[in-house]
């Protein structure tokens, strides 16, 4: 009997450039492979035994001749290389038109509407920036004037940063809800609240970030599961990404270690349904900051935490580990990279095998749909291959 399926998304842990990566400025990107070489090798015994070394060339993680999980990689069919696009495609929504980006900052009509409708005293920034850098550059002026820091990136995001002593958290969230409504017609994927704390020169972002996503333009596999009475637990930023559609329970997390511990605890009480987990630290703390050493430590932390999750799985359960895009910390860019993503599928007691290169992330959603007996419109299920 199919009971529980766990998806762990190692946010940004791509495994090699897609054929069209050059068009995105990402030729040669390989988040996992390049990170391993930058640090002189990774120690990932659990992931190695699962077959991660078959997915791309990872220094320190050779291909295991008898992997314990099924291994492969997935290519993104949608245009883009961001969190929203990647997660939506995983759950059966392929975007034919990329989401809107603003490489020159946001036009006056957006900024003026934001200021007018929120009552904010203006904005600072309105540029493409690294979030950790711009709060150091503008944080003191923000605290003096009360103006929030607005910025974007190569992704379709409108980010609003504010010090929690200057703009209360709930006020920041309210401003972002207003921005979400303003930006819906502009096809901006996410409005992100970026609270920070600290003193000038030592500002630090908190885990109270909140994403306000535009709703998916089509029905996702998650919604079909809920309609069929299947519980769906969203861990980390999963509920935000899907605008809380197709989610029956939300679990907030404070980083990867917390998310992994909460996932293990969930498996002690959840006896049926989908547990969908996003592990954001790879992307937020290390990929965007071009920190391969930190990225390597996070991968090794994941490896150490996996046994507590795998040991809680029983006959009929499945676990899939994947990513939503790349964010190669070894390249000059601090933005996401257009990459394949790894696919490891663990079925207790069934050994492993090669799932090849899937032509869309939606193959994962199609597999989830078949596992729980609901319809999917996009992708090819590999359920038979991992349960034979």
Swiss-Prot record:
Mn(2+) 1 binds at residues 11, 324-325. The keyword Cytoplasm applies. Its EC number is 5.4.2.7. It is an enzyme of class 5 (isomerase). One of its GO terms (molecular function) is manganese ion binding. Gene3D superfamilies: Alkaline Phosphatase, subunit A (3.40.720.10), Phosphopentomutase (3.30.70.1250). Coiled coil: none annotated. Its cofactor is Mn(2+). CDD domains: PPM (cd16009). One of its GO terms (biological process) is 2-deoxyribose 1-phosphate catabolic process. It catalyses: 2-deoxy-alpha-D-ribose 1-phosphate = 2-deoxy-D-ribose 5-phosphate; alpha-D-ribose 1-phosphate = D-ribose 5-phosphate. Binds 2 manganese ions. Mn(2+) 2 binds at residues 283, 288, 336. InterPro entries: Alkaline_phosphatase_core_sf (IPR017850), DeoB (IPR010045), Metalloenzyme (IPR006124), Phosphopentomutase_DeoB_cap_sf (IPR024052). Its main location: cytoplasm. HAMAP family: Phosphopentomut. Belongs to the phosphopentomutase family. Isomerase that catalyzes the conversion of deoxy-ribose 1-phosphate (dRib-1-P) and ribose 1-phosphate (Rib-1-P) to deoxy-ribose 5-phosphate (dRib-5-P) and ribose 5-phosphate (Rib-5-P), respectively. NCBIfam families: deoB, PRK05362.1. This is Phosphopentomutase. The lineage of its organism: Bacteria, Pseudomonadati, Myxococcota, Myxococcia, Myxococcales.
């Amino acid at each position: 009997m199919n009971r529980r399926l766990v998806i762990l998304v190692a946010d940004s842990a791509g495994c090699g450039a897609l054929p069209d990566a050059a068009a995105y400025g990402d030729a040669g990107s390989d988040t996992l492979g390049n990170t391993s070489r930058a640090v002189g090798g990774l120690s990932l015994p659990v992931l190695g035994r699962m077959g991660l070394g078959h997915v791309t060339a990872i220094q320190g993680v050779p291909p295991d001749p008898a992997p314990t999980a099924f291994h492969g990689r997935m290519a993104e069919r949608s245009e883009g290389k961001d969190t929203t696009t990647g997660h939506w495609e995983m759950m059966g929504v392929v975007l034919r038109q990329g989401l809107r980006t603003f490489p020159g900052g946001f036009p006056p009509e957006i900024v003026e509407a934001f200021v007018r409708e929120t009552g904010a005293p203006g904005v600072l920034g309105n540029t493409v920036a690294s979030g950790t850098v711009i709060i150091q550059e503008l944080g003191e002026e923000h605290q003096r004037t009360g103006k929030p820091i607005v910025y974007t990136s190569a992704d379709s995001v409108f980010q609003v940063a504010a010090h929690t002593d200057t703009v209360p958290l709930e006020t920041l969230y309210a401003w972002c809800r207003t921005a979400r409504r303003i930006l819906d017609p502009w096809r901006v994927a996410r409005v992100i609240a970026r609270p920070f704390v600290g003193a000038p020169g030592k500002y630090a972002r908190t885990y109270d970030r909140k994403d306000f996503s535009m709703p998916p333009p089509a029905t996702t596999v998650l919604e079909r599961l809920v309609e069929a009475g299947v519980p769906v637990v969203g861990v980390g930023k999963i509920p935000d990404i899907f605008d809380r559609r197709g989610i029956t329970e939300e679990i907030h997390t404070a980083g990867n270690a917390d998310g992994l511990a909460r996932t293990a605890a969930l498996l002690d009480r959840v006896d049926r349904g989908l547990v969908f987990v996003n592990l954001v630290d790879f992307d937020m703390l290390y990929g965007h900051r071009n920190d391969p050493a930190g990225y390597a430590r996070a991968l090794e932390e994941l490896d150490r935490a996996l046994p507590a999750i795998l040991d809680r799985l029983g006959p009929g359960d499945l676990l899939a580990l994947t990513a939503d895009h790349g964010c190669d910390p070894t390249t000059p860019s601090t933005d996401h990279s257009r990459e394949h993503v790894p696919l490891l599928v663990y079925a207790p007691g069934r050994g492993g095998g090669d799932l090849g290169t899937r032509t869309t992330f939606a193959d994962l959603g199609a597999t989830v749909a078949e596992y729980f007996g609901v319809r999917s419109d996009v992708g090819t299920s590999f359920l038979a291959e991992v349960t034979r």
